Amino acid sequence: MLDRLLGWFSVDMGIDLGTCNTLVAVRGEGILLNEPSVVAVRKGTNRVLNNGNAVGYQAKEMLGKTPGSISAIRPLKDGVISDFEITEAMLSYFIRKATGRARIISPRVVIAVPSGITAVEKRAVLDSAERAGARRVYLVEEPMAAGIGAGLPIAEPTASMVVDIGGGTTEVAIMSLADIATCESVRVAGDDFDEAIIHHMKKTYNLTIGEQTSERIKIEIGSAA
């Protein structure tokens, strides 16, 4: 009864916690936030700059440009948490930004995770979200979330295929009858494309470029055809 009452005053939130970008959607309002999964901290203390607000776009602007005392961290690697405390700080910032500081009741949160992660890695996501301010946390496998979002008939007795290329992982899944029949997750994805472009530019043209330039090249001239 109490949980139902709290639900009337809180929000239901979906989070796509990616290696490169994090998206936050709120029920009835759609996607409210799409920002880089980057946090700027002071070296030695891991204190998030700007009173905990140097996250997302603000932090990404510091990538490759930060002084020696500041580090721009991406707390997820290959689709999983590599820095628990920084992930917690990042989630806390994104939840606050998406829901507004005035809300008293913490949100219920669904988080999309790679299908191939371990039980320990899932536990890390749950703990980070709870410590960041979520009232209840549920996990859904990314291929399933992608299939639902794309409007595929995943609940019907027919096969639907999803290829989800993220920043740290690529997932290929076949779904039918609201279940994943088979799925393969490989830790080769967008970040590796960016790195390959950087190496190619250096080797072929003796030109050094940064992560943001490499990503822009990938987006503007890349093709899946």
Where in the sequence are the language-model features?
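Nucleotide/phosphate-binding catalytic cleft detector across ATP-hydrolyzing
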Residues: 1-165, 173-225
